[in-house]
Amino acid sequence: MAKQSMKAREAKRAKLVTKFAEKRAALKVLISDVNASEEDRWNAVLKLQSLPRDSSASRQRNRCNQTGRPHGYLRKFGLSRIKVREACMKGEIPGLRKASW
């Protein structure tokens, strides 16, 4: 189990990402616009740098919904490989069963 503080930190990051997503996207469009003046582009870079570091989507880490485990995360289920296996063995995931060949 991950510490509660780590789970809370990831939740805080998720909120920041959604809060600043539009603003970050607009600034990135302005920065990559070759028709904009150099001064406008540079000001956009400075504004982007002034945003909170955790508002970047690349700072987020996918974590298991049950345990908070950061490694072995399966996006399709939102769980770590360990919890997916446990749920599979109990028959809690429809259509998923242990491989046999």
From Swiss-Prot:
UniProt KW Flavoprotein keyword: no
Alphabetic keyword roster: Ribonucleoprotein, Ribosomal protein, RNA-binding, rRNA-binding
GO annotation terms (biological process): translation
One cellular component term from this protein's GO annotations in UniProt: cytoplasm
One Pfam family per UniProt: Ribosomal_S14
GO molecular function: rRNA binding; structural constituent of ribosome
InterPro entries recorded: Ribosomal_uS14, Ribosomal_uS14_bac/plastid, Ribosomal_uS14_CS
Xref: PROSITE patterns: RIBOSOMAL_S14
Function per UniProt: Binds 16S rRNA, required for the assembly of 30S particles and may also be responsible for determining the conformation of the 16S rRNA at the A site.
Subunit relationships: Part of the 30S ribosomal subunit. Contacts proteins S3 and S10.
Family (UniProt): Belongs to the universal ribosomal protein uS14 family.
HAMAP family (alphabetical): Ribosomal_uS14_1 (MF_00537)
Listed PANTHER family: 30S RIBOSOMAL PROTEIN S14, SMALL RIBOSOMAL SUBUNIT PROTEIN US14M
Name of the featured protein: Small ribosomal subunit protein uS14
Organism for this UniProt entry: Aliivibrio salmonicida (strain LFI1238)
